[in-house]
């Protein structure tokens, strides 16, 4: 076996659950959100959140507009409330931010990613032929300075200072530190 961490962010339900079951160490979903909040193609079910929790895995909540309730119009409060609600399904020590950002990249980058090199057909992911580019970021997270907004938003929905710091980075650090 290879000592690596498996990331199932781009995988469907069955594959994700199978990876959690088969892996000898915890896996991650580095950038997705719960389906209970938004029915995005890559967002994860309560069953996956529970399996991640029980196996010691991690989820990073995504800021990519196609993964967000109300897309680019998602509010900071809604996003932070989703994180708080998620802690009923997965430990606050097993959650983080997985921004999945390509800020200020031209649409040609996403066109290249979706060019269908192997399938020979264009895959628009969660976009469409009419809306194939990068959607605008929510106003509260237009770049890395948005972490200040996340800090405030998490505190506003009831997370302690320690929990907020854990969610904003310490949990990822502690998770990966176990695999040195």
Roles of regions detected by a PLM:
Residues 53-76:
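A conserved active-site cap/scaffold subdomain adjacent to cofactor or substrate pockets
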Residues 11-17, 34-37, 65-69, 103-105:
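Active-site environment of divalent metal-dependent phosphoester hydrolases
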Residues 24, 53-54, 84, 88-91, ...:
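Sec-exported extracytoplasmic/periplasmic mature domains
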Residues 6, 31, 59, 100, ...:
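Conserved, mostly hydrophobic/aromatic
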Residues 90-140:
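Short acidic/histidine-rich active-site segments
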């Amino acid at each position: 076996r290879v000592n690596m961490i498996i990331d199932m962010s781009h995988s469907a339900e069955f594959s994700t659950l199978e990876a959690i079951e088969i892996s000898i160490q915890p896996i991650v979903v580095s950038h997705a959100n719960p389906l209970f909040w938004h029915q995005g193609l890559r967002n994860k079910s309560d069953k996956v959140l529970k399996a991640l929790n029980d196996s010691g895995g991690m989820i990073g909540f995504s800021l990519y507009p196609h993964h967000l309730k109300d897309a680019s119009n998602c509010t900071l409060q809604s996003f932070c409330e989703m994180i708080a609600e998620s802690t009923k399904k997965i430990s606050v020590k097993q959650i983080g931010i997985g921004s999945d950002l390509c800020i200020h990249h031209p649409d040609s980058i996403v066109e290249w990613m979706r060019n269908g090199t192997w399938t020979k057909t264009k895959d628009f992911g969660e976009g469409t032929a009419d809306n194939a580019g990068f959607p605008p970021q929510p106003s509260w997270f237009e770049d890395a300075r948005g972490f200040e907004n996340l800090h405030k938003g998490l505190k506003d929905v009831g997370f302690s200072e320690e929990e907020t710091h854990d969610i904003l980075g310490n949990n990822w650090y502690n998770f990966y530190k176990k695999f040195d």
